[in-house]
Amino acid sequence: KPVTFFLHTPWPKLVPNDVIAIKILEFLATGMLAADVIEFQTQNDLQAFEEFALTHLTTQTTAGKLKVNPVSVEVQSLQNQMLNHEHSLELTESDISYVHVARTDPIKNTLVAIASFANVVRNSEPSQVRSYLDVYLVPSRQQWPSYQGLLTEIAECVNKYNDILSSLNYSPIRIHIGNDYHRASQALIRYDYLIACSVADGLNLVVKEGAILNNRNGVIISTESVGAMAELGKFCVVAADPTQVCVTQALLDANALDFESRRKMSAELKRHVQEFDSSNWAQNVVANFKVLEKV
């Protein structure tokens, strides 16, 4: 008998009110319940799926195994990048680097990331130290007008806040458009603050890549809506909500951390991602085969 899997599975944490959306979820859940193994990204995803199935599919049961096994990154490959990296980011050693890496997707909350950074810089004491936000965007779903409009809106937002901050005599927000993985990786090595403030995000591997690549005790600022925070939230600054007010406050909290706190958080991030890397994820997947062979 073939073994069937669902891997790296997200599930909505809130059940929509829309009847059609519920029907679609019922259709998906019915197929999933026929699988031998369903692996979810987080415990919250698993619990949300169980609650949905119990409520909406009361006559259907599953003999399959439900478990949490979040996908991860290939640590050795990332560490090799660190050995071969080149500094080409137009930053001096004293510059403070904020980084946001995302697809052009509304859920990534890029507009809030930009506005929150601008709030922090605008309300900071005058300083000789420059702060930059480098926004790395991979255009996504550009065949859809709403996504085309978002990219335009982000560019306009960058120009607006650079104008507001013109008294700094430099442009603190820089936008980089294109799928340039090498340059984005350089930014992850160099950041002081990595902003991943998604409204909803199944996992977000950028924060795991950043945790391994970074060499400056950089702080990750995120939200509870980012799936990776189920694993890493204890070692990050997590905004109460993905709103501009809350993300701004999270940035201020991150700025207030002392050197030792930053060092410990960075070390714990690296330790956790190294322990639960992509090979650990794959071993957990393969272990399912061994169990099912005995059934």
Explain the meaning of each model-derived region:
Residues 67-180:
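Conserved catalytic-core segment of nucleotide-activated headgroup transferases in glycan assembly
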Residues 180-192:
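Short acidic alpha-helix that forms the nucleotide-activated donor recognition element
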Residues 1-13, 31, 37-40:
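Active-site proximal beta-strand in glycosyltransferases
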Residues 7-10, 70-71, 225:
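Histidine-centered beta-alpha loop that forms part of the nucleotide-sugar donor binding/catalytic region
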Residues 33-68, 73-85:
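A short, active-site helix/loop in glycosyltransferases that binds the activated sugar's phosphate group
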Residues 126-132, 189, 193-275, 284:
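Catalytic binding pocket for nucleotide-activated donors in carbohydrate/polymer assembly enzymes
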Residues 22-38, 268:
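Membrane-proximal helix-turn-helix segments that form the acceptor-binding/catalytic region
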Residues 278-295:
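C-terminal alpha-helical cap of glycosyltransferases
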